[in-house]
Amino acid sequence: MKLKSVSTYCQSAMSAGLIYTRDENGEIIRQHLVCRQMIVPLDGMPVISGDQLPALLDVPEEKRDAWFVSRIERDEGTGKELSWMLEDRQPGNIPAILLPMTLAVNDVIVQPVMDEACVARMQFVRVDALKVTDDIKKERTYALRSRDGRTVLMVMKGMTARAAIMTDTAWISEAANEWLECLTNEAARVVRERGKDERAEGR
């Protein structure tokens, strides 16, 4: 994605964030630009600070004070359960959890991130590849199916499938399995209740 397109998207949202990935020595080894559900790698560029980000995106100087700029720190560490914290100019911190699992989407390995609005952001995946609406107020339903020994996570909007995410079982941790089980149980409950309502209406 070209930086100009990224800039236009970020300016429409009036927000942007930086993801810093550090090694065990604390050195920044990679950085990403994040806006809503879009995450773009900034490979080959010098380390960018939050103060430099609006200038990089060509935001007019007189409009920069109205922008929401966040910083996300990721600690490589042991590679186990990781947590991210968004630090912003607002009072308090907004937690964002990097779920302890990796997924294979369109032959690309990704990791889902759950933020304060419970929106899953997929690292290294284009927004249109997931086809999940930006409107966090719209209901989402999750269902799980097994295929060739692997688990497929279906993201539903009503009765329409919005995304199919196949998990890489070799990377799934116990915590991730518990998370998937919770989704399965919730999806089953929704289906059961919907079936009861439909049968009641039929009578």
Task: State the predicted function of each range.
Residues M1-I28, H32-L42:
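Intrinsically disordered, low-complexity linker/loop segments enriched in Gly/Pro
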Residues P41-D58:
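Conserved mixed alpha/beta catalytic, RNA-binding, or beta-rich assembly cores of soluble enzyme
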Residues L33-M38, A55-R203:
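C-terminal functional regions that serve as terminal interaction/effector modules
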